[in-house]
Amino acid sequence: MLLTGPSGAGKSRLAERLSSAHGWPVVRLDDFYREHDDPHLPRSPIGIPDWDHEDSWHADAAVEALRRLVDDGRVEVPVYDIGASAITGRQVLTAGPHDYVLAEGLFAGRLVEPLRAQGLLADALCVRQNRFLTAARRFTRDLAERRKPPHILVRRGLALLRDEPRVVAEAQAHGARCIHPRQAESELAGLPARALPSAR
């Protein structure tokens, strides 16, 4: 189950609530970002890692982790610290045979095609709200988590506010359907248990 959408739209909170209610594992796609010393990590015009660039993360590794979690019921994934721009540890995620796996992140929509090709995709949702509310929540979150210095957060936040319509349109182009977090929570809460996949 892919949850994509603009930064700050409520993807992580939605995933946490669903996980708490149903026991579904959550794969944070942010944990697959490249580290600060990776020569392939794109840079923004203001000199910091460009977390909003499609090449800023390891998409293939994320797909492989999701496949292992669904097929094997267990996978080890990295733990990434945005503030440090580095992997700070590892964690093991487990899934029951009938669990849905929630994969949330800005670029989740880019996984629609490869996951569908492997028979792993249940649905893809683009979580969105009023973009000014999203911008305010994003700034509050990033400031509280000390992700970057305040002046950088302001500049990045304004850029993301302007760019949000493109982000949403791109998610839709990949096949994600737009939905408010509350509506998504209501819909997903009523899902039947996941059917066991056929042999691939």
Regions inferred by a protein language model and the residue ranges of each:
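Conserved lysine of the Walker
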Residues: 11
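NTP-dependent small-molecule kinase module
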Residues: 96-97, 140, 159-200
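Post-Walker A helix-loop "phosphate-sensing" segment adjacent to the P-loop in P-loop NTPases
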Residues: 20-30
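Hydrophobic anchor at the beta1->P-loop junction of P-loop NTPases
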Residues: 3
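ATP-dependent NMP and nucleoside kinases share a basic, alpha-helical "lid"
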Residues: 88-147
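The conserved Walker
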Residues: 7
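Conserved nucleotide-sensing/catalytic segment adjacent to the nucleotide-binding pocket
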Residues: 25-26, 34, 39-85
